[in-house]
Amino acid sequence: MSTFENKTAIISGGAEGIGLAIAHAVGARGMNVVIADINPDQLRIAEAELRQAGIPVLAAELDVADLGQWQDVADQAVKRFGKVHMVVNNAGVGGSGGTIEETDPKTWQWVLDVNLMGVVYGTQVTVPLMKAHGEGGWVVNVASMAGFGPLPLATPYTATKAAVVAMTEGWSLELAPEGIHACVLCPGFTQTRINLSERNKPARYASGAGAGSGAAKQLDGALKRVVDEGMPSNVVAERVIEALESKEMYVFTHPSYRPLAQVRFNAANAAFDRAAQSPLLAEYVNLPLPDFSQE
């Protein structure tokens, strides 16, 4: 029997890209699939595609920035399939590129609400359902390699993806005793439409801001090219399956991107070395690490 057979997954941003590819991957292994997406037209297309593949599927509209909508989707999932065993917090947006001055507050709020709070809400709603049935489960949070290093002129995006990595690290420790495995997917450039995410921006985030700088427009053009030439989404999805079966916490898809992460780690190591050599800190060099397990 498959690890996933007869279990149920809720996948946000499930109507296309990585979300739809994961729906196919887990569905092919016997899972019931709930695809939730803000785009109703794309949702209907994806639902038909999954049904054609013989996958039990429920399609539900979802704005991940709305906690009430998350609760509605979870209720629909339980009503249809009985239990929820997996959440894939995949929905994400890029936001328009720009400098500090050019990135308006509504762009920040949109990216924070979707990329960060959407993950928080999805996890807060589904984890109690997994704990209730006691059969274990999975929390799969989709971040990005941008969570390990800066992407020029895309600070809201990189900040939220770094936050998703940090949240998953904490949740992994918290949920492991419950038999719930939390992991964070950090793909490199993949064939999705993340560079076109403005098309799904709700009216409440409209800013009326003017066009970005020439540098931002150049970045947008470069992003389109690398996304179009990126890894196929189905390869990313199969990598997720592989990682879930081996209980990996950090799920990387592009081994050649290792140097991007090492820039931060190497810089941190060098900064610690400088701190250790500071006369101001001489008496603190050998302080023990705090032990939070003690009462």
Label every model-predicted segment.
Residues 40-41, 60-72, 105:
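The beta1-alpha1 cofactor-binding region of Rossmann-like NAD(H)/NADP(H)-dependent oxidoreductases
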Residues 144:
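Residue(s) in the substrate-gating loop at a strand-loop-helix junction
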Residues 29, 149, 170-180:
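Active-site-adjacent segment of SDR/Rossmann-fold oxidoreductases
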Residues 2-34:
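Canonical Rossmann dinucleotide-binding motif of NAD(H)/NADP(H)-dependent dehydrogenases/reductases
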Residues 177-255:
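SDR active-site lid
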Residues 123, 160:
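Active-site helix of classical SDR
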Residues 98-100, 104-110:
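Substrate-binding pocket helix/loop in short-chain dehydrogenase/reductase
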